[in-house]
UniProtKB/Swiss-Prot annotation:
Keywords: Hypusine biosynthesis, NAD. Belongs to the deoxyhypusine synthase family. Required for the activation and stability of deoxyhypusine synthase DHSc. Required for cell growth and survival. This is Deoxyhypusine synthase regulatory subunit. The keyword Methyltransferase does not apply. It comes from Trypanosoma brucei brucei (strain 927/4 GUTat10.1). Pfam families: DS (PF01916). The keyword GTP-binding does not apply. Heterotetramer formed by a homodimer of the non-catalytic regulatory subunit DHSp and a homodimer of the catalytic subunit DHSc where DHSc appears to bind spermidine and DHSp appears to bind NAD(+). GO terms for cellular component: catalytic complex; cytoplasm. PANTHER family: DEOXYHYPUSINE SYNTHASE. Disruption phenotype: RNAi-mediated knockdown causes cell growth arrest followed by death, loss of DHSp expression and a failure to sustain infection in mice. NAD(+) binds at S72, N73, L74, I75, S76, T98, A99, G100, E104, D213, T282, G283, D316, A317. Pathway: Protein modification; eIF5A hypusination.
Length: 342
């Protein structure tokens, strides 16, 4: 804009009268296309959409990679199928999550997760065998089913280690891949909705640096209490993630989609040299921690390179993520084509 000494453009109004006179699908497309010029957080969402759409379309082409980081509550929510679709269509090249981000995906193959209310009485939930994830409810039976599924897998891995006289060191990502294979064998009718299954099928590594921080950690502990010698070694996973994200060995563009903050965000960005990063977070600068600090702090702390293209969208990922990933075309175009055609 003339006379303004920094990048800017005229605000674009959303023509609400027009939205009332067109079909729902076209109206959604118009709103998505309008986001970059609306201002405030809508502009950040519009900018983030353009990065995400282009990256998903280009994943695997010319060495380009998309890496997804998410917190466990998101896989507990209805976003699970969205993530599974990205893996099924090979739109992502690696995943970083918490232990719960693995467990809750598998648990949904074994039982239903319910939607309740944020204000439900916690004592009553506990007395009725229900666990809370915000307003989501997970019955105790689901975790018992998960134990029945997971312990035999540990037994097989332990036997492999013992037979190799412990020259075989099992990493968290290898265990997660074994979980995907077990789902295909044990739950063939349910595994099609699982992110972990599709990552296994398409050889997409899933990294979980805090693998023992959850139900799987409990089971590994109790298994080793009665049967000594099961070893889980996370160090090779760090090396593998760094190799995937090292610019000196990759000619393509690396884009990181970070949904939520905490461990997944920090572990991914500290080990990957990203060209573009999209954050979706409700974290506040006042937290004073690297997992939810702002873009300037992340640059200062070395998580982002000076030339990294970064957009931080402040909001609930269950609301923002579908808008980032939703195609605004009529379905004839490939995923990721930008609205402006560029």
């Amino acid at each position: 804009m003339s006379g303004v000494p920094f990048p800017s453009r005229v605000i674009g109004d959303l023509d609400y009268s027009n939205l009332l006179n067109i079909g729902q699908e076209e109206a959604i497309r118009c709103v998505l296309n309008a986001y970059p010029n609306i201002g405030l957080e809508a502009t950040n969402l519009g900018r983030a959409r353009r990065i995400v759409q282009r990256a998903l379309n280009d994943n695997g082409m010319d060495g380009n990679k998309v890496m997804l980081a998410y917190t466990s509550n998101l896989i507990s929510s209805g976003l699970r199928d969205t993530f599974a679709c990205l893996a099924r269509e090979n739109r992502i090249g690696a995943v970083v999550t918490t232990a719960g981000g693995v467990e809750e995906d598998v648990i949904k193959c074994l039982g239903d997760t319910l939607v309740g209310d944020f204000a439900l009485n916690d004592h009553a939930l506990r007395n009725n065998g229900l666990n809370r994830v915000g307003n989501l409810l997970v019955p105790n039976d689901n975790y018992r089913n998960f134990e029945d599924f997971f312990v035999p897998l540990l037994r097989r891995l332990h036997e492999q280690q013992r037979d190799s006289r412990w020259t075989t060191k099992t990493t968290p990502s290898q265990i997660i891949a074994e979980i995907g294979a077990a789902l295909e064998s044990v739950r063939p009718n349910d595994c099609g909705s699982s992110l972990i299954y599709w990552c296994y099928r398409n050889d997409i590594p899933v990294f979980s640096p805090a693998f023992t921080d959850g139900s799987m950690g409990d089971m590994i502990y109790f298994y080793n209490y009665s049967r000594k010698g099961l070893v889980v070694d996370p160090v090779p996973d760090v090396r593998r993630l760094r190799q995937l994200g090292c610019k000196s060995t990759n000619v393509g563009r690396i884009t990181c989609i970070v949904l939520g903050a905490g461990l997944p965000k920090h572990h991914l960005l500290r080990n990957v040299q990203a060209d573009a990063v999209v954050y979706v977070t409700t974290g506040s600068d006042a937290d004073g921690c690297e997992s939810s600090c702002n873009v300037m702090a992340d640059r200062a702390n070395g998580l982002l390179s000076p030339n990294c293209d970064v957009v931080r969208v402040h909001g609930d990922a269950t609301i923002i993520s579908p808008l980032l990933l939703l195609r605004s075309s009529d379905g004839k175009e490939k995923v990721g084509v930008r609205e402006d055609g560029n």
